[in-house]
């Protein structure tokens, strides 16, 4: 069993039950899924960049991403409906905990001038979104093989009803929020 999953069952669940006075342990919020999305705008002119982005996401997450396509045509961006413009991965279960553990303990501390993640990035329904400016913070990415620095959005979806519950859950998991 994963280190974080074990910690959730043994330490975090009792702590949240006592803090929020839940009647049942089933009311305790948990991380449902993590969605990693990267937009590749250059894919319109050069399809090889999309292949590189897909390969990097596969290395980071250990799961093959889905190629996302344009919903509408936009003449200003020379974009046609249905053109591939990005990639996304949805992680659940064991892989989700592995990725979250790696994100919190290895990748985020590698960010330059890192002072913690923003507390304001909750959406009002207990989900947390975080933007990463470069994929180089992940240990799986080889610096010499990177053709272009790309960012990505990481959405952590929880079953929490409020932002306060979600913030407490992520703090217990070791998410480094700003002071």
From Swiss-Prot:
Function in brief: This is one of the proteins that bind and probably mediate the attachment of the 5S RNA into the large ribosomal subunit, where it forms part of the central protuberance. In the 70S ribosome it contacts protein S13 of the 30S subunit (bridge B1b), connecting the 2 subunits; this bridge is implicated in subunit movement. Contacts the P site tRNA; the 5S rRNA and some of its associated proteins might help stabilize positioning of ribosome-bound tRNAs.
Protein name: Large ribosomal subunit protein uL5
Known partners and oligomeric status: Part of the 50S ribosomal subunit; part of the 5S rRNA/L5/L18/L25 subcomplex. Contacts the 5S rRNA and the P site tRNA. Forms a bridge to the 30S subunit in the 70S ribosome.
Gene3D superfamilies: 3.30.1440.10
GO CC, alphabetical: ribonucleoprotein complex; ribosome
InterPro entries: Ribosomal_uL5, Ribosomal_uL5_bac-type, Ribosomal_uL5_C, Ribosomal_uL5_CS, Ribosomal_uL5_dom_sf, Ribosomal_uL5_N
The entry's keywords: Ribonucleoprotein, Ribosomal protein, RNA-binding, rRNA-binding, tRNA-binding
Stated family: Belongs to the universal ribosomal protein uL5 family.
GO biological process, one term: translation
Keyword rRNA-binding: yes
Native source organism of the sequence: Bacillus anthracis
SUPFAM superfamilies according to UniProt: RL5-like
Molecular function terms from GO: rRNA binding; structural constituent of ribosome; tRNA binding
